[in-house]
């Protein structure tokens, strides 16, 4: 028996009052929360509901009754379809205000701890072309916008090189210009597409798993170096060679050119070996006179300039003294560890990924830093009381965990080690708030500084300074 199609209501004159979790705009209708994308506080809209849950509904705008005075003009032609920069229609100052409010709300509501005045979110000097890394997907058929479908024109089955439609693994929006990464990123992507189309290269189909061209990663450094990694679905050596030779000739600024053959059904390449086809096996980033080696698999903050501001906040909060021992937990490739090393006696870094630890050691060597020591392994297994006894009790601990936050046993070890200060850097204030509550018996929050690493998105980093009570 066919399932009866739900008959959802049309909500007229809904006032959008605020931005909620994950950057969703919301209003209330009959005391029920209604989430509406692509709106801003102050908009009054007619909304067609498309889904209902027990505590909320979701819908889309069918008519703007009144547009908010806060509304800004989106600068990207793909806004509203691409999921990359959903806050383009909100002035940047308002974005920062909402991010500050988001941090305050989550630390207060989830952490339930005493807080000082939260500093205004530190804005990014660049709000366009600020990313140093983008990954593009090849698809045999591009996603058609509603306007294209309704135009009834000849739209054909053209392929795409761009980004996935949010929530749709097999749908790709063809990107003509992206405002996230500086040149030559747009040129490389467009030229790769042109060459492949004109020379009969097949583009990947995520459902049938056919088609040679899969992905392309472009990394740009503040030093001017450029890395390109092209991912193919099979080892078609003549076509691989022809494309890479063409890109190398067309863009002499590419200093590192790699390819990967990925025959798996998913796009992850972390377990595959990149082949250096031409140039160096890395690019170099610079920060305050330090040089950082970035390989094809290396993690590096994707907003280089704002990463510097973030790390300066963390270092200032750490307030290191001569003779101090610093523990940098979840150290990644050791960027913070090396950034702080000159201000203390020694730094101990721990990270789960062995390749990241290898990069951290290389970066210390590259900069002539001799007072760092790095360990690879699961944080819960590596950091215990015996580890602290062997490496020295930390005077300061910097935490920079993944979104899931810090495991409770790790917090227990930190509490027993009793550093005089903890600096907690987080990309997820919700889990940060949970962890701060666990530290609250022994440490009080002295300062809170949100940092905007990703303009025009809801994402916010937050740095908290804790001192012993």
What is each model feature region?
Residues 25-30, 162-165, 360:
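Short, acidic/hydrophobic/Gly-rich beta-strand patch recurrent on exposed beta strands
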Residues 1-78, 373, 381:
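Terminal RNA-binding accessory module
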Residues 2-21, 235-469:
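Rossmann-like S-adenosyl-L-methionine
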Residues 42, 181, 303:
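Short, conserved phosphate/pyrophosphate- and ester-handling motifs at nucleotide-, phospho-/glycolipid
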Residues 62-74, 80-202:
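Extended interfacial segments that mediate partner engagement and assembly in macromolecular machines
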Residues 170-206, 210-212, 220, 234-258:
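Internal alpha/beta scaffold segment
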């Amino acid at each position: 028996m066919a399932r009866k199609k739900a008959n959802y209501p049309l909500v007229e004159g809904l006032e959008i009052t605020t931005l909620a979790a994950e950057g969703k705009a919301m209003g209330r209708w009959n005391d029920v929360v209604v989430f509406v994308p692509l709106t801003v506080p102050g908009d009054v809209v007619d909304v067609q509901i498309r889904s209902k849950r027990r505590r909320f509904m979701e819908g889309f705008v069918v008519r703007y009754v009144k547009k908010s005075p806060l509304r800004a003009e989106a600068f990207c032609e793909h806004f509203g379809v691409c999921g990359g920069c959903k806050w383009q229609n909100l002035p940047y100052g308002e974005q920062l205000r909402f991010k500050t409010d988001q941090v305050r709300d989550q630390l207060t509501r989830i952490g339930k701890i005493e807080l000082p005045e939260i500093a205004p979110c530190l804005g990014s000097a660049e709000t366009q072309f600020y990313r140093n890394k983008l990954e593009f997907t090849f698809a045999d058929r591009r996603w058609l916008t509603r306007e294209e479908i309704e135009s009834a024109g000849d739209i054909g089955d053209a392929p795409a090189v761009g980004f996935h439609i949010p929530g749709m693994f097999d749908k790709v929006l063809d990107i003509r210009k992206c405002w996230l990464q500086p040149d030559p990123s747009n040129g490389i992507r467009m030229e790769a597409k042109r060459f492949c189309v004109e020379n009969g290269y097949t583009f990947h189909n995520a459902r049938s798993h056919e088609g040679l061209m899969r992905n392309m990663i472009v990394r740009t450094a503040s030093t001017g170096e450029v890395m390109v990694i092209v991912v193919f679905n099979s080892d078609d050596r003549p076509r691989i060679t022809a494309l890479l030779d063409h890109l190398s000739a067309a863009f002499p600024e590419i200093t590192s050119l790699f390819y990967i053959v990925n025959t798996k059904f998913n796009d992850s390449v972390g377990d595959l070996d990149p082949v250096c086809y031409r140039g160096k096996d890395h690019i170099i980033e610079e920060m305050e006179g330090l040089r950082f080696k970035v390989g094809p698999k290396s993690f590096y903050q994707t907003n280089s300039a704002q990463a510097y501001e973030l790390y300066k906040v963390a270092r200032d909060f750490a307030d290191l003294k001569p003779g101090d021992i610093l523990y940098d937990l979840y150290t990644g490739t050791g960027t913070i560890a090396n950034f702080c090393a000159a201000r203390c006696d020694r730094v101990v870094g721990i990270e789960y990924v062995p390749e990241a630890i290898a990069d951290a050691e290389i970066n210390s060597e590259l900069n002539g830093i001799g007072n760092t020591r790095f360990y690879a392994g699961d944080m819960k297994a590596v950091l215990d009381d015996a580890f602290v006894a062997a490496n020295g009790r930390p005077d300061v601990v910097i935490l920079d965990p993944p979104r899931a936050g810090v495991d409770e046993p790790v917090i227990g070890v930190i509490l027993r080690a009793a550093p005089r200060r903890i600096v907690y850097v987080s990309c997820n204030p919700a889990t940060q708030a949970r962890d701060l509550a666990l530290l609250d018996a022994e440490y009080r929050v002295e300062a809170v500084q949100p940092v905007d690493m990703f303009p025009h998105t809801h994402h916010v980093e937050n740095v908290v300074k804790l001192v012993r009570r």
